[in-house]
A protein has these predicted regions:
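Non-catalytic macromolecular-recognition regions in eukaryotic signaling proteins
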Residues: 30-194, 205-246
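N-terminal Sec-pathway targeting helices
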Residues: 2-21
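Charged, low-complexity, helix-prone segments enriched in Lys/Glu/Asp/Gln
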Residues: 9, 194-196
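Hydrophobic alpha-helical membrane-insertion segments, chiefly the h-region
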Residues: 20-31
Length: 246
């Protein structure tokens, strides 16, 4: 009887240990997924590019040769590429930048977000029609057309602009000026007065119905914009960006 009782106790202890190990493994897997996200997505974010600079918006009611309201612009680009190691056939339905918010406002100026504009020479123009408050969506298409908010369904580039406006007035009688971050320095602005932090969700939706989302925070502008005029940064080590299904 005593041996039978010991065997039962031993069996229960072994079962309890097995159950505990099972839940520990499940918990560890969930924690790892929460931190690292998906590891074999059909399309991968391969690069984030940031360009910080500045320009002037003309003040029309003036006799000065140059009279500008200064704006500091930060253009952020996300490059998605097809994962050649993913064996299933997939295509992009849309890529969106959602839940856009300013976590830290600059000490000076007014902040806005902009989507690409058909009226812009390049991608962006700081006009009211192109302002976004919550999200910008790029629809999947056979080819990319950024100004039409279209991205190739096999991968492409999407972007958004974060602008700090109403930073001051630049007045000059010089023959020629260059529109860049040096204008900000010329009116006495300091980097710490521009320091900001933004956050958003980057969402990838496939035509199969699968959706992935990654939360991203970014400090802006880039540190050297006041000294170099135009500051650029490319981020390819993206382990901190964790896409998860939702």
């Amino acid at each position: 009887m005593l041996n039978d009782r010991k065997k039962k106790i031993l069996k229960r202890a072994v079962m309890l240990i097995i159950i505990m190990l099972f839940f520990i493994i499940i918990g560890f897997s969930m924690l790892k997924y929460e931190v690292e996200g998906e590891k074999n997505m059909p399309f991968q974010l391969t690069k984030i590019s940031i360009i910080s600079t500045a320009n002037g918006i003309p003040n029309t009611e003036t006799l000065d040769r140059w009279n500008f309201n200064l704006v500091q612009n930060n253009d952020i680009y996300f490059n998605f590429e097809k994962n050649e190691n993913y064996k299933e056939q997939e295509s992009i339905k849309k890529i969106s930048i959602e839940n856009i918010k300013v976590l830290q406002s600059p000490l000076k100026g007014t902040t806005y977000f902009y989507r690409p504009s058909q009226q812009a020479v390049d991608w962006y123009e700081n006009i009211e029609e192109a302002r976004v408050t919550d999200k910008v969506e790029y629809q999947g298409n056979e080819t990319s057309n950024v100004k039409e908010l279209q991205v190739s369904n096999q991968g492409g580039i999407v972007g958004i602009r974060f602008a700090i406006e109403d930073l001051g007035t630049y007045v000059s009688e010089e023959e020629q000026i260059t529109h860049d971050g040096l204008l900000l320095k010329s009116i006495g602005l300091k980097q710490e007065e521009l320091k900001s932090k933004i956050a958003f969700d980057l969402v990838l939706e496939l035509n199969s119905g699968i959706r992935y989302k990654a939360y991203i925070e970014q400090e802006l502008p880039l540190d050297s914009v006041l000294e170099e005029g135009i500051s650029k940064k490319e981020i390819t080590d993206l382990n901190y960006v964790a896409f998860k299904r939702f």
